[in-house]
Every structure is written in structure tokens, then in C-alpha cells.
Amino acid sequence: MKKAVTLLDGSVGQELVKQYGEKPTPLWSTEIMLKDPNMVSNIHSAYFEAGATVATTNSYTILRDRLKHFELEHEVHNLWNSSVAAACKARDKFGSGRIAGSIGPLVASYRPDICPP
């Protein structure tokens, strides 16, 4: 029996740190989505070209409670859409592939007893 292999992309976040050239902040990967979503799309493209068949959205830190601390909670939907669009742009450029969403840690994000609103 032949088994299929699904190859995910690598660490989008660490590539952003490497390519962005600035020290990461609590919003570093989210900040890139606001300033230069093409950088994210280019990273996805490089992973597709290297053989990945799935691009993971750059959305791990796009959490309303985190954004609220920086008065950016109104951007949550725009940022999610932008992270999906960046991955789709790379996939469409490559010609094939799938997109997987990346959701941050549930404990810190969704438990009001640990992380109050």
C-alpha cells in the first residue's frame, strides 16, 4: 500500500524574524501583516518552491486579547483575511497546494480565568 506524504511549510514566524531584520516584539508577526504582507507571501512562495504542499497562515499571534493591549483589536478580521490572502497568493502563484490556518494557544487566549478580557 502506497502512503501519501503531506509536506507542510516551515516556520513562517522564524523566517519573518530572519528577513525582517528587527528584534521581535509581542506583535512582530502581526506587525508584518500590517506593514508588508508581501513579505509573508514571498515566504510562503519559497516554501512551495522547496516542495511544501501546505502553507500555514501567519495568524498564530492574531488574537483579539493580544491586539487589545495595543489598541488594535479592531484589526482582527482584517489581519486574519490578510494572512489567508498572503498564503493564497503564494499558492496561486505556485499553481497548487492547500492552506492551513494557524491558531494561537487556547489556554492563554480563551480562558478568562487565566487571561481576563
Show which residues each predicted segment covers:
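Domain-level signal for soluble alpha/beta catalytic cores
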Residues: 1-117
